[in-house]
Design a protein with these regions (language model features):
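Membrane-embedded segments
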Residues: 1-31
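Alpha/beta-hydrolase active-site loop signature
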Residues: 6-10, 79, 165
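Gly/Ala-rich beta-loop-alpha elbow adjacent to hydrolase catalytic centers
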Residues: 45-49, 53
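Hydrolase active-site cap/lid region
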Residues: 55-115
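Short beta-strand/loop motif that positions the catalytic acidic residue
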Residues: 120-123, 127-134
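C-terminal catalytic histidine-bearing segment of alpha/beta-hydrolase fold enzymes
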Residues: 136-189
Length: 189
C-alpha cells in the first residue's frame, strides 16, 4: 500500500494545485510501475480525492503503463467540481454558480471515466461508495456517477454505507467490509 501525500498537504512541501497534484499522482504511479511491475494496482480516493484518483487512472491507462489498474475505489465521490458548485449553490440569483470558469481545480470524474472507457484497454472495476447521510455531497452526484458507469459499460459495484456522514464511510464496519470484499474480488483468479 502506498499513500500519496500531495504537495502542500501533510508533510509535503510546495503549493497545492491541480496540475501539481496530477504530477504527484503520475510520479507515484511511475514509481510503482518501475518498483513493482507485477503488482495489482487499486487506486482509492475519497471525496475530491476520487476525482484525483479517477484522473490518475485515466492518464495511467492512456499511457499504457504496466501494471494495469485493476480497481478504482471512489469513496463519497462527486461527478465534478463544477457539478458540486451547482449543487451547493442552486439558486440562480446567487453569483456562485456563474463563477465556474474561475475555479482553480476542475477535476471531473465523469470525464475521467469516459477517458478510461475509451482508452481501448481493460478498464478497472469501479467501487462507488457513497455515505447515506453525507452532509457535503448530495445523492444526485452518486446517481450521476452510477449512470455514467452504466452508459460507458464499465463494471462497477455500489455500496451505500448506511448512516455514514461524508468522512465516515470507511470508518464504519460496513464500508471496511465493502472495500475488503471489492479487493478480494479483484484478486480472485
Amino acid at each position: 500500500m502506498i499513500a500519496l501525500s500531495y504537495r502542500g498537504y501533510w508533510k509535503s512541501a510546495g503549493k497545492a494545485s491541480q496540475r501539481g497534484i496530477e504530477l504527484d499522482a503520475q510520479a507515484m504511479l511511475d514509481f510503482v510501475a518501475s518498483a513493482y511491475p507485477h503488482a495489482m494496482l487499486v487506486l482509492w480516493g475519497q471525496s475530491m480525492g476520487a476525482g484525483i484518483a479517477s484522473t490518475a487512472a485515466a492518464h495511467h491507462i492512456e499511457r499504457s503503463i504496466a501494471p494495469p489498474i485493476a480497481g478504482l475505489i471512489m469513496e463519497t465521490p462527486f461527478m465534478s467540481i463544477e457539478s458540486m458548485l451547482f449543487a451547493l449553490y442552486p439558486q440562480k440569483w446567487l453569483p456562485y454558480r456563474y463563477l465556474s470558469p474561475f475555479l482553480r481545480s476542475h477535476w471531473d470524474s465523469g470525464v475521467a471515466l469516459r477517458r478510461i472507457a475509451e482508452a481501448g484497454k481493460q478498464p478497472p472495476r469501479v467501487l462507488l461508495m457513497p455515505a447515506t447521510r453525507d452532509e457535503v455531497v448530495p445523492p444526485e452526484e452518486i446517481e450521476a456517477l452510477e449512470q455514467r458507469c452504466k452508459d460507458l459499460s464499465l463494471e462497477y459495484d455500489r455500496k451505500n454505507v448506511l448512516g455514514a456522514l461524508h468522512t465516515e464511510a470507511t470508518s464504519r464496519r460496513e464500508g471496511q467490509q465493502a472495500v475488503a470484499e471489492f479487493v478480494r474480488k479483484l484478486a480472485a483468479p
